[in-house]
Swiss-Prot record:
Record-given protein name: Triosephosphate isomerase B
Pathway membership: Carbohydrate degradation; glycolysis; D-glyceraldehyde 3-phosphate from glycerone phosphate: step 1/1; Carbohydrate biosynthesis; gluconeogenesis
Origin superkingdom: Eukaryota
Function noted in UniProt: Triosephosphate isomerase is an extremely efficient metabolic enzyme that catalyzes the interconversion between dihydroxyacetone phosphate (DHAP) and D-glyceraldehyde-3-phosphate (G3P) in glycolysis and gluconeogenesis.
Catalysed reactions, as listed in the record: dihydroxyacetone phosphate = methylglyoxal + phosphate; D-glyceraldehyde 3-phosphate = dihydroxyacetone phosphate
Organism this protein belongs to: Danio rerio (Zebrafish)
Lineage of the organism: Eukaryota, Metazoa, Chordata, Craniata, Vertebrata
Length: 248
């Protein structure tokens, strides 16, 4: 056993309303969830407070983004301090949709990671290659570069979960094979060992995201270096329970 606690995050993205969030919370609260798995639900900003009030205290909540400073003239942004004020402990940063739809740079994501950690939030930091990058054989080059910008901004790795999400597998129904996922996770751990420390490489959780379903989760979860999942669409459905219990 690695000693790393299995971690399952649900990223609701821009989905849901009060009615559906309450229904989902009731489903999760009444389900038998593996007590050895850490569970976090990423709610839309406007529903952070509501999700926190409806979910069982054993289920944490994450914001899906935050800005790199505490307050100021940044219309539409939210700060880690505001997130914490809602009773929320985590934030997802660097998701491929933030990178590719909203044009966030590696540098900006690194700055956001630093500020979130300084303010006591846990960070789910996302990395991953696009299809043309995988086909060009530069997967490692891309994910190592993204990881470096994150690593350069981390002082305390105990509050960081790395999420490897191959962009070509997000919302497409394509999933990296368990072997493909394990290969990248293993290479990431080696990179951390070389560039950060062996202790961090052994302790940091590296989770997988990209069309994870109730049907694919068990075999993925059996991979040595795969410490959990960041789940998109399936986190809005009852099958999220099967994914949480993939290690049960």
């Amino acid at each position: 056993m690695s000693g790393r606690k299995f971690f399952v995050g649900g990223n609701w993205k821009m989905n849901g309303d009060k009615k559906s969030i309450e229904e989902l919370a009731n489903t999760l609260n009444s389900a038998k969830l593996n007590p050895d798995t850490e569970v976090v639900c990423g709610a839309p900003t406007i529903y952070l407070d509501y999700a926190r009030s409806k979910l069982d205290p054993n289920i944490d909540v994450a914001a899906q983004n935050c800005y790199k400073v505490a307050k100021g003239a940044f219309t539409g942004e939210i700060s880690p301090a505001m997130i914490k004020d809602c009773g929320v402990k985590w934030v997802i940063l660097g998701h491929s949709e933030r990178r590719h739809v909203f044009g966030e740079s590696d540098e900006l994501i690194g700055q956001k990671v630093a500020h979130a950690l300084e303010n006591g939030l846990g960070v789910i930091a996302c990395i991953g290659e696009k299809l043309d990058e995988r086909e060009a054989g530069i997967t490692e080059k891309v994910v190592f570069a993204q990881t470096k910008f994150i690593a350069d901004n981390v002082k305390d790795w105990s509050k960081v979960v790395l999420a490897y999400e191959p962009v070509w597998a997000i919302g497409t129904g394509k999933t990296a094979s368990p072997q493909q996922a394990q290969e990248v996770h293993d290479k990431l751990r080696q990179w951390l060992k070389t560039n950060v420390s062996e202790a961090v490489a052994n302790s940091v959780r590296i989770i997988y995201g990209g069309s994870v379903t109730g049907g694919t989760c068990k075999e993925l979860a059996s991979q040595k270096d795969l410490d959990g999942f960041l789940v998109g669409g399936a986190s809005l459905k009852p099958e999220f329970i099967d994914i949480i219990n993939a290690k049960a």
